[in-house]
Amino acid sequence: MLVFIDLDGTLTNTTHPGWRPYRDGQEDVDVNMVPVFQGAKEFIQECYNRGIHVVLVSDSHPRYVEPIRAMLGLQGIFLADKPNTQRLDEYIAVSPILQQELTHPENCYFIGDTKLDIEIGRKMRIRTILLQLYSVPDSDVDVHSGVGDRMGNLKMGPTYCAFSFTDVLQIFDDPDRKLYARESRIIGQESTNVIRFWEHSYSYDTKTAILCLARQEEGLCDSFARSDKYREISNPNRAPEFLDLLAGTLSSYLHFFESTCPPSIRWTHLTYLSDKSSTKPPEKMKQIFDRIQSGIPKAKLLTWLERNQGSLRNQVDYQSRRQFLVDFLRVDDGVDLRGANIIVIDDQLTTGATAHYVIKQFRDRGAKNVFFIAFFQMIMEVGDAVICPQCGQKMKIRRRARDGKRFYSCVPPQFGGQGCGNIINID
């Protein structure tokens, strides 16, 4: 097994701006003053006890990194230019051991606290772990690097989320069953893990949240994110067995979810973002919703106005999506939702505009707990830097809707790009 691991924010609590002069190599660091996260040293030793190769990957200055590396007992070290992988690729190219390990990417991990770490891991097509050991005040959140930006880091699409080094070791012990619920089910395993995209607690038994069961990747990623399975939802020829598996994943999760809720919460409504009359295939979500097995009473609480024009999918940003929802999506006026506890099902989470709007509408109508659960979260695109041989534009990885096969696309203007339309098959 091979583990690449970040330093600042992952092994040491040194993301605060006060550490910048040391990280930049402007001052010598006293290793006795470096705040090492609880369990970090023990984790490193346990990795070595298991025969795991560990490589420290940091973009801080060698003057700062080297003494901390020695203090932590780390054997491997590489100084990177995150999220650029060129120098890391060169480092791997002269190490037969690392090359051999990477022939089995399912046994390789990149562990870090920010989206830059996750992006590197995705470019390497290995498993990634977002390790969340600290919080920062809003004034210290760095949306560029991802320090403290929890939602931005989740949008990069880590394979796993962990909150301690014990969590990380448990992932190592049973990696396929620690995947997100839908991703684990695809490979024949069972998991109750979900992407906890957003949560807000009002009290012990009053909460709103946005959860996702799997990732829908764009571009490079590990092999467990499956955009092809998301696209199958909209396939007019989708098989009933596919719908059964999709609904089965959610049924299993709902059973687990209910068992973990406070006894005072009784879920009163299970609903879904209903299909528009123009939706293809017809009743796309209803056919899945009807297959869900749950003791929670089902109800159709959301409807689209028939006068709606266009598609939510074609609204390119958060604000335009929200305005489309304001104009055309309605909550059933005939249902008293005061004190209700509602779970809403949808096929995809993109910007979060739909989820937040629906949650607010139900809360405004008096609902207490509202959980929005999407089958797939669309994660950030990670490119492959392939250049079109015909026009010189960067190409993007896409999947064909009809068969799920990947290809490089020089995206033309009619699809939002500036390319010539050239296509190179991958699969």
Language model feature labels by segment:
Residues 1-45, 49:
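Active-site neighborhood of HAD-like aspartate-dependent phosphohydrolases
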Residues 28-55, 66, 86-89, 260-269, ...:
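Short, acidic loop-to-helix structural element flanking the phosphoryl-transfer center
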Residues 62-109, 115:
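Substrate-recognition "cap/lid" segment bordering the active-site pocket of phosphatases
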Residues 105, 119, 123-135, 309-387:
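PRPP/pyrophosphate-binding module of the type I phosphoribosyltransferase fold
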Residues 110-157:
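Acidic, Mg2+-coordinating phosphoryl-transfer loop and its flanking beta/alpha structural elements
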Residues 174-265, 306-334:
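Active-site-facing substrate-recognition patch
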Residues 388-391, 410:
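Short cysteine-rich clusters marking metal-coordination/redox-active sites
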Residues 413-427:
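Short metal-binding segments enriched for Cys and/or His
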